[in-house]
Amino acid sequence: MKINNNEEILAPEVQVEGASNVRMKILIGPEDGSGNIIMRHFFVAPGGNTPFHNHDYEHVIKIERGRGIAVDENGAGHEVAEGQSLFVKPGDLHQFKNPFGETFEFLCIIPNPAKQQ
């Protein structure tokens, strides 16, 4: 078993085209011995957003703090908040935005993309 102290993990700015004011911690990943899944913690600052994008794998999301807008494959926005979870199917376009006044945080669990090759 591997136990990490999440407060000690750095949260660098996401350097992906289309992302703005987003930081991400990798809480559990290959460096921890997890060959199949990766757990990430995203922080979307007020006015920030992830890119509108898709993947060829499914993933699950749990809202940790604050509120945000989950944009679906049709471009429709859905307000989401702490206590909610989302499932994103392979190929679904999606995005997260934060038009609110506090940081929006969520966990995102994905398969290890290297294993999908």
Role assignments for model-derived ranges:
Residues 40-55, 90:
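Conserved short histidine dyad/triad with adjacent acidic residue
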